[in-house]
C-alpha cells in the first residue's frame, strides 16, 4: 500500500473523529463500507492496524509508533516541557499520572510489592521486576553487534551507542563531546560545581543521581547481590564480581618482579610499590606523599573536608552523621544487629555477617596446599603464608617486613599518622580517643560494664559479652573437626591447633613444645621460678595472672559460676567447665600408647609422662626431678622442714 493511500486512510479516520454522529464509515481501500451501530474509536483503531502492521499511530517528533492513540498522546508529553501532574506533598511535578502515583507511595512509605527471594519490599511493581533479575542472574537483552548481554533494556540501549561513532552532544565550556545528552548534563555539573542530588538521611550532596543511589545503600544496609557459592551478600554488583574470583581461585594478575599472582589488578598495583619504593600519590597542600591512593584520600580530609558532626562524649569529629552514629555505639554500648539463630547482638552489620557463618558451618575458602578450609578469605590468605614463610609487605621507612598487609598498614601509622592522644599515667600514645579511654580504665580501675546476672563488672564491653555466656551456656563457636563448642572465638582458635598439630614454640630447657608463645612464657617460669603476680591481701605470688585471679576469689568468697545440673558453685568458669564433664561423662582425651581416656587434657599430659619418662619439674636444692609440680612441692617441703637435731 502506498503512503498516499495510508494518508487517505488516516484522513478518513480523522473525519470520523470530528463527526461522531456518523454511523457508517468507509475506508478508501475497501470496496464496501463497514457499519457500526455505536461509533467509537476502537473500530477505527482495529481497522487501521490492518494497514500499518499493528502500529498505526506515529509520533512526528521521533518516529516512534504505537498501537493506540491514547498511548501516543501520553508519549507526546515527553517532547513537551509540560508536567501537569503535581504532588501535593512536596510540589514535585510529573508528565504522567502513573509516575505521580508511584512517587506518592514514597511519602506514605508503603511498599506493597515484596520479593519472594529475599523479602525486600518496593513501592512500584516495575522496580520489583527489575530487582528480581539480581537473584536469577538473567540477562535477556543481547547486543547484536558484540553479543554482550544485559539485565535491562535501558542498559542495552545505552551500550549500543558504543558501536556508533557519533558524539553529537558537545560541552560549550571545554569542548568535550558525548554520545548521550544525559552524560553531557552530568558532565556540565563539574563546571557549575552543582550537587543537586541530596541524601535525605545525612544531607550529603552529589553531582550525579547514580552516586546518590550508591550512597543511600549505606543507610539502608541493603545488600541485594548474593554469592551463590557461599551466600555472602554485597551492596554492589561490582563487589560481587570481584568476590567470585575467591571461589574460582583465579589469580590472573602476576608481578613481573617476584612472580607473585593476585586476583585483582588493584592489589597487584599496590604490591608493585613494595619493589619500587615509589610514593606516587602526593598531597598538593603540604607535599606529603603516599604509596596508596586511599591513604592520600584519608589525609586530604585534614585539609579540605568539613567535619560538622562531633561526638559529645570524646569530641571526635566526623564528616557524616552515619559515621558519628556508628562511633557513638562505642560509648552507649548499643548493639542493634541481632543474630536470629542465637540472639547475639553486634554493633555493626559486617560483624553480624561474619558471625552468621559460624551457624551455617560453611567453609568455602580452601587451602590448595593442605586442604584446610576457612570461613573467610582473609583467614585463608594469612594461613597460606605458613606454607611459604613469605613476608612480602615491607615498610619503606624502617625496612620491617610483615606477612599481612593489614599489619603493615597498622605499622605505617607509627611513621606517618599523628597520635594525638597520650596517657598521662604511663605516656602510652593512642591514635583515637576511644582507645585512650579504654586504656585509662586500667589505671583508674573503672569497670562501667556490669553483668545483670551476678553483678560482676568489666572495663570493656567485649569482656562482659564473653562473661555473659557463662550464665546463658551459649557456645556459638564450634570445632568442625570434633564438634566441641566454645563460648569464645579465641578458645576455638587455640583448640583447633590440637588437630593441626602445630607446636611452634619450644622450651630450650626441657624441649617441651607449645601451640602459643604465651604458653611457652608461662611454662618457662617453672624453670626460672619467677612469680610476678602477687596477691595484695596475703602476699602469695603466682607465675600466671589467671592463677592470681582464681586465688583472689578465696578472699572475697565469690562463686558466680553455678552448675545447672547439681547447683554446685565455683569461683572460676574453668572449674565449672571441668565439673560439668562429670555429668556429661565426656572423656575426650585418649592416650595413644595404652588407650586410657581422660576428661581433661592436663590429666592426659600427666599420664603420658609415665610412657615418655619425662620429669620436667626439678628441685634446685638436690637436682631430683618429678613428673608433676605437686610432687615437686611435696618434695621441697623436706628441705624446708627442720628437725630438732638440725637446730
UniProtKB/Swiss-Prot annotation:
It comes from the Eukaryota. A zinc finger (C2H2-type) spans 57-79, 85-107, 113-135, 141-163, 169-191, 197-219, 225-247, 253-275, 281-303, 309-331, 337-359, 365-387, 393-415, 421-443, 449-471, 477-499, 505-527, 533-555, 561-583, 589-611, 617-639. Its main location: nucleus. The keyword Zinc applies. GO terms for molecular function: DNA binding; zinc ion binding. SUPFAM superfamilies: beta-beta-alpha zinc fingers (SSF57667). It holds the Pfam family zf-C2H2. Keywords: DNA-binding, Metal-binding, Nucleus, Repeat, Zinc, Zinc-finger. InterPro entries: Znf_C2H2-type, Znf_C2H2_sf, Znf_C2H2_type. It is found in: Nucleus. One of its GO terms (cellular component) is nucleus. This is Zinc finger protein 11. It comes from Mus musculus. The lineage of its organism: Eukaryota, Metazoa, Chordata, Craniata, Vertebrata.
Amino acid at each position: 500500500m502506498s503512503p498516499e493511500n495510508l494518508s487517505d486512510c488516516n484522513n478518513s479516520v480523522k473525519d470520523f473523529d470530528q463527526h461522531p454522529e456518523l454511523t457508517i464509515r468507509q475506508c478508501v481501500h475497501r470496496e464496501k463500507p463497514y457499519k457500526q451501530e455505536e461509533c467509537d474509536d476502537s473500530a477505527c483503531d482495529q481497522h487501521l492496524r490492518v494497514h500499518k502492521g499493528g502500529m498505526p499511530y506515529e509520533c512526528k517528533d521521533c518516529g516512534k509508533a504505537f498501537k493506540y492513540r491514547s498511548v501516543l498522546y501520553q508519549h507526546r508529553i515527553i517532547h513537551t516541557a509540560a508536567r501537569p501532574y503535581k504532588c501535593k506533598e512536596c510540589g514535585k511535578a510529573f508528565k504522567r499520572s502513573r509516575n505521580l502515583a508511584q512517587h506518592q507511595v514514597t511519602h506514605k512509605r508503603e511498599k506493597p510489592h515484596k520479593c519472594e527471594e529475599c523479602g525486600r519490599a518496593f513501592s512500584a511493581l516495575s522496580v520489583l521486576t527489575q530487582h528480581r533479575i539480581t537473584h536469577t542472574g538473567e540477562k535477556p537483552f543481547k547486543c547484536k553487534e558484540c553479543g554482550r548481554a544485559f539485565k535491562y533494556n535501558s542498559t542495552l540501549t545505552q551500550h549500543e551507542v558504543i558501536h556508533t561513532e557519533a558524539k553529537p552532544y558537545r560541552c560549550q565550556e571545554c569542548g568535550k563531546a558525548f554520545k548521550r545528552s544525559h552524560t553531557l548534563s552530568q558532565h556540565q555539573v563539574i563546571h557549575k560545581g552543582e550537587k543537586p542530588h541530596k541524601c535525605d538521611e545525612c544531607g550529603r550532596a552529589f553531582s550525579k543521581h547514580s552516586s546518590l543511589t550508591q550512597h543511600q545503600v549505606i543507610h539502608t544496609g541493603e545488600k541485594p547481590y548474593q554469592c551463590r557459592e557461599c551466600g555472602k551478600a554485597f551492596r554492589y554488583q561490582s563487589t560481587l564480581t570481584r568476590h567470585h574470583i575467591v571461589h574460582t581461585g583465579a589469580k590472573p594478575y602476576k608481578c613481573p618482579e617476584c612472580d607473585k599472582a593476585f586476583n585483582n589488578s588493584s592489589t597487584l598495583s599496590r604490591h608493585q610499590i613494595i619493589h619500587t619504593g615509589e610514593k606516587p600519590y602526593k598531597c598538593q597542600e603540604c607535599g606529603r606523599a603516599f604509596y596508596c591512593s586511599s591513604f592520600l584520600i584519608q589525609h586530604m580530609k585534614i585539609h579540605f573536608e568539613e567535619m560538622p558532626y562531633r561526638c559529645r562524649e570524646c569530641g571526635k569529629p566526623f564528616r557524616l552523621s552515619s559515621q558519628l552514629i556508628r562511633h557513638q555505639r562505642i560509648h552507649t554500648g548499643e548493639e542493634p544487629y541481632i543474630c536470629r539463630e542465637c540472639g547475639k547482638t553486634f554493633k555493626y552489620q559486617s560483624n553480624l555477617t561474619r558471625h552468621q557463618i559460624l551457624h551455617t558451618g560453611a567453609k568455602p575458602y580452601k587451602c590448595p596446599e593442605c586442604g584446610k578450609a576457612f570461613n573467610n578469605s582473609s583467614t585463608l590468605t594469612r594461613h597460606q603464608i605458613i606454607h611459604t614463610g613469605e613476608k612480602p609487605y615491607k615498610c619503606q621507612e624502617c625496612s620491617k617486613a610483615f606477612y599481612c598487609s593489614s599489619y603493615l598498614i597498622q605499622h605505617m601509622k607509627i611513621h606517618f599518622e599523628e597520635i594525638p592522644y597520650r596517657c598521662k599515667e604511663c605516656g602510652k600514645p593512642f591514635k583515637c580517643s576511644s582507645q585512650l579511654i579504654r586504656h585509662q580504665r586500667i589505671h583508674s580501675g573503672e569497670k562501667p560494664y556490669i553483668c545483670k546476672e551476678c553483678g560482676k563488672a568489666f572495663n570493656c564491653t567485649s569482656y562482659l559479652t564473653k562473661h555473659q555466656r557463662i550464665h546463658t551456656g551459649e557456645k556459638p563457636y564450634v570445632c568442625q573437626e570434633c564438634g566441641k563448642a566454645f563460648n569464645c572465638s579465641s578458645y576455638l582458635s587455640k583448640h583447633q591447633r590440637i588437630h593441626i598439630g602445630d607446636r611452634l614454640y619450644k622450651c630450650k630447657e626441657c624441649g617441651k613444645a607449645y601451640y602459643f608463645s604465651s604458653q611457652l612464657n608461662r611454662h618457662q617460669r617453672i624453670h626460672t621460678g619467677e612469680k610476678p603476680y602477687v596477691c595484695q591481701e596475703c602476699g602469695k605470688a603466682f607465675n600466671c595472672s589467671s592463677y592470681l585471679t582464681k586465688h583472689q576469689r578465696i578472699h572475697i568468697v565469690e562463686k558466680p559460676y553455678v552448675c545447672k545440673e547439681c547447683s554446685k558453685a565455683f569461683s572460676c568458669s574453668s572449674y565449672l567447665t571441668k565439673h560439668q564433664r562429670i555429668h556429661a561423662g565426656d572423656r575426650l582425651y585418649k592416650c595413644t600408647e595404652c588407650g586410657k581416656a581422660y576428661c581433661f587434657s592436663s590429666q592426659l599430659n600427666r599420664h603420658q609422662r609415665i610412657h615418655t619418662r619425662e620429669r620436667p619439674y626439678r628441685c634446685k636444692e638436690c637436682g631430683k626431678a618429678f613428673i608433676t609440680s605437686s610432687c615437686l612441692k611435696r618434695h621441697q617441703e623436706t628441705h624446708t622442714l627442720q628437725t630438732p637435731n638440725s637446730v
